[in-house]
Amino acid sequence: EGLKTEHELQAYLIRRMEHFLKSRGRKLLGWDEILEGGLPPDATVMSWRGERGGIEAARQGHDVVMTPGETYLDAYQSDPATQPEAIGGFLPLQRVYNYEPIPAALNADQAKHILGVQANLWTEYMPTTYQVEYMAYPRAVALAEVAWTPKDKRQFDDFHRRMQAHYLLLQRHAVNYYRPSTFLAVNAQPDYTRQVNLISFTSEQYQPEIRYTTDGSSPTAASNLYTGPFPVAGQTEIRAAIFKNGQIQGAPTAYTANYHKAI
């Protein structure tokens, strides 16, 4: 065949396989490595090494299934110290939902070649179907909405609200899904005019009741109720936790905010 490189060998094999599949009424679908050496005319590409392969294939007029890192449900979905061992990475629910499968780099005609998305769940770190369910849900629900809903109709806060009903449905069907963590993430945004830090909290919980202190003491059901970002000056020891029916949910989050002249 006069092949000189491994890329030419791969292209030769892919062309042969496409001819074989086409003769039997099938169509070739391959990971984006099949771009190396040239694509057969009717090949569809699965873009898994980021979006670059999908963009290149769509520009050449080939159909594409987008399946980059934002679709790999075998990654950790919360603090690895609290989760079953996984292959690595970090892919929380909101990152899955915020993924947009049609790259901005494509024009309208090229974008028509993006067929959709695929979730990936490699199970070498999952010894049981019980754990497979745990890794798949609720992130698979988020990706389904990404696939089926136009970008201008997707809004995470609204999805988060509607997801509460899906949690009940998953429970009804005895699905071992990941329960949203009670961990609170703390963000400190400097306000240079007032020379303070504006403190805000985010949580995987839906509309949680967050109580906090600014003197280093553990929060109680009578502590300050978080309603939005609040200012703290100098060095401040913040403690915060989620409460439900007067009871603390999980361990308090500790954070030291420090506004000083070097900021």
What are these regions (language model features)?
Residues 1-62:
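Active-site neighborhood of glycoside hydrolase catalytic domains
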Residues 21, 45, 140, 212, ...:
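Hydrophobic, well-ordered secondary-structure elements that form the walls
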Residues 22-32, 64-68, 150-156, 178-179, ...:
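Acidic/polar loop patches that form or flank catalytic/metal-binding clefts of enzymes
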Residues 29-33, 46-48, 65-67, 120, ...:
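Generic beta-strand/beta-sheet core signal
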Residues 35-40, 52-54, 71-76, 123-128, ...:
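Flexible loop/turn segments at secondary-structure boundaries
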Residues 57-69, 75:
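Active-site rim recognition segments
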Residues 77-79, 83-196, 204-208:
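Substrate-binding clefts and catalytic carboxylate motifs of secreted carbohydrate-active enzymes
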Residues 154-263:
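Short, compositionally stereotyped local motifs that mark structural "simplifiers"
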